[in-house]
Swiss-Prot record:
It is found in: Mitochondrion inner membrane. SMART domains: PHB (SM00244). This is Prohibitin-1, mitochondrial. Its main location: mitochondrion. It is a peripheral membrane protein. Keywords: Coiled coil, Membrane, Mitochondrion, Mitochondrion inner membrane, Transit peptide. It comes from Dictyostelium discoideum. One of its GO terms (biological process) is mitochondrion organization. Belongs to the prohibitin family. Prohibitin probably acts as a holdase/unfoldase for the stabilization of newly synthesized mitochondrial proteins. InterPro entries: Band_7, Band_7/SPFH_dom_sf, Prohibitin. Pfam families: Band_7 (PF01145). Residues 201-221 form a coiled coil. Residues 1-24 form a transit peptide.
């Protein structure tokens, strides 16, 4: 029995050692990842390794796993505008490493390449672009500013083998004094527009009254001319007046109209 145990122990140690070596000689690269191989003798290998299970030489080689999917990051910078206003701007970037240059990225920057590059790079670009615009231009030309920041950041990041899939301004604010000044200016503009509207309205009403008065005066003038120049019109007005008098007399109970040649009116109810 003791002899059997003495033989079993070395065998178990051999098998265990073999399994350990086999396990340490294998590694897996998941989806959305790449591996860079570091060799203790030759250094970082020039080619990155794709997805799947791969073999390495235990102890001599070590896989460094990179996530190559796009990752978000916010970059904030407090800077100054062209007219010396304090500006706080934050941009959101979606970044990923250039797969073709992973060995170089690891050799020069390491796994935390984004932490080493993006904050300083973003701060540099934001200060440079914002300084070209006045505070009001940063508001009114936000799309232009955002485009310039995006193009500049992408260009600079590419120098470090970083790819930016998207860059957008998420926050843009100014000092409290400038904000208050903008609000006061907007209120003043609204009041000016309101006053302008009231003046225009009064002017229109004044013009309308003048036109109406001129029209009425012209109409009265034309009527006067017609009355003075038209005998038929005068005769018509005389007949209408005579008709009104006749109708008024016919309704009176104390007056009788006698159609004689003298057109006499006689009071029949003399007291």
């Amino acid at each position: 029995m003791q002899s059997f145990l003495n033989k079993l122990i070395p065998l178990a140690l051999t098998v265990g050692t073999g399994l350990s070596l086999a396990q340490s000689s294998m590694y897996t690269v998941d989806g959305g990842q790449r591996a860079v191989i570091f060799d203790r003798i030759s250094g970082v290998k020039e080619k990155s390794v794709g997805e799947g299970t791969h073999f390495i030489m235990p102890w001599l080689q070590k896989p460094i796993i990179f996530d190559i999917r796009s990752s978000p990051r916010n970059i904030k910078s407090d800077t100054g505008s062209k007219d010396l206003q304090t500006v706080s701007v934050t941009v959101r970037v979606l970044f990923r490493p250039d797969v073709e240059h992973l060995p170089s990225i690891f050799s020069k920057l390491g796994l935390d390449y984004d932490e080493r590059i993006l904050p300083s790079l973003g701060n540099e670009v934001l200060k440079s672009v914002v300084a070209q615009y006045d505070a009001t231009e940063l508001i009114t030309q936000r799309e232009v500013v955002s485009k310039e920041i995006r193009e500049s950041l992408m260009k600079r990041a590419k120098e470090f083998n970083l790819l930016l899939d998207d860059v957008s301004i998420t926050h843009l604010s100014f000092s409290q004094d400038f904000t208050n000044a903008i609000e006061h200016k907007q209120v003043a503009q609204q009041e000016a527009e309101r006053s302008k509207y009231i003046v225009m309205k009064n002017e229109q009403e004044k013009k309308a009254n003048i036109i109406r008065a001129e029209g009425e005066a012209e109409a009265a003038k034309l009527i006067g001319q017609a009355m003075g120049n038209s005998a038929a019109f005068i005769e018509l007005r005389r007949i209408e007046a005579y008709k009104d008098i006749t109708e008024s007399l016919s309704k009176s109970k104390q007056v009788t109209y006698v159609p004689t040649s003298g057109n006499l009116l006689m009071n029949l109810n003399k007291q």
